[in-house]
């Protein structure tokens, strides 16, 4: 039974978002790390994200039942966990999540977490996902909140660095989500979910992906130019970004194997975001001017 409650929180999504929260926190800390604050922020953020994922599972249970990728989820399989239990579980996770965030004594992190949860559950999952091809753009804001929460927990302010993290992670979400939409095109058709590839076509979606990858590249450059990361960070992430962009352009040469290309783009987007989070976390420790001189 415990494993079903764990599955309901989408642990992979929670873990990925915690990596970005850690990256945001550590880049704002600039080496002066408060470990108690870090742990409190991580636990609180994890619980709030888990709550959002449970609520998303509750809202999407009807479409999950008809999609090949999601038909084995806990709420689709009758008898594993009941609906009222799931709702209670989500509420408890949310309460304890915000309780932990209150221990940071940083009201900003609570506000940002509440905004992210509201956008993901109320605006994206409950409303826009079934109605608009632009739902992922709104959803990308909630997906970009964890690094901003981590940053603001350490910096205790929403400054240009927090804004740049919001932009960077929002831009990454679009090509990542589009690659899933192409890869699972038939799934979304069966569930009547209006995705960009279904409504505008795969070729138009490829254009969209390339534009957002270019925007992502520019944003990561600006983040370094503004003094938040080292130039070694910029060199490493730029090499990876150009690889991603190259693969995006390669999609124009694909005619009959869009799903295979989309799978490669999806996996590459994961490599990019994991690398970005690791670089953000380690940048001040490994690549700061002080450490290089030493």
UniProtKB/Swiss-Prot annotation:
Compartment(s): Cell inner membrane
Lineage: superkingdom: Bacteria
Key word Transmembrane helix present: yes
Annotated transmembrane regions: 8-28, 35-55, 81-101, 107-127, 133-153, 163-183, 209-226, 230-252, 266-286
Annotated signal peptide: none
Keyword Transcription appears in the UniProt entry: no
EC number(s) reported in the record: 2.5.1.141
Pathway where it operates: Porphyrin-containing compound metabolism; heme O biosynthesis; heme O from protoheme: step 1/1
Chief place where the protein resides: membrane
Catalytic activity: heme b + (2E,6E)-farnesyl diphosphate + H2O = Fe(II)-heme o + diphosphate
Protein's GO biological process: heme O biosynthetic process
Membrane topology qualifier: Multi-pass membrane protein
GO molecular function ontology, one term from the record: protoheme IX farnesyltransferase activity
GO cellular component, one term: plasma membrane
InterPro entries, sorted: Protohaem_IX_farnesylTrfase (IPR006369), UbiA_prenyltransferase (IPR000537), UbiA_sf (IPR044878)
Alphabetic keyword roster: Cell inner membrane, Cell membrane, Heme biosynthesis, Membrane, Transferase, Transmembrane, Transmembrane helix
Comment field (misc): Carbon 2 of the heme B porphyrin ring is defined according to the Fischer nomenclature.
Function: Converts heme B (protoheme IX) to heme O by substitution of the vinyl group on carbon 2 of heme B porphyrin ring with a hydroxyethyl farnesyl side group.
Family note: Belongs to the UbiA prenyltransferase family. Protoheme IX farnesyltransferase subfamily.
Identification of the protein by name: Protoheme IX farnesyltransferase
Higher taxonomy: Bacteria, Pseudomonadati, Pseudomonadota, Gammaproteobacteria, Enterobacterales
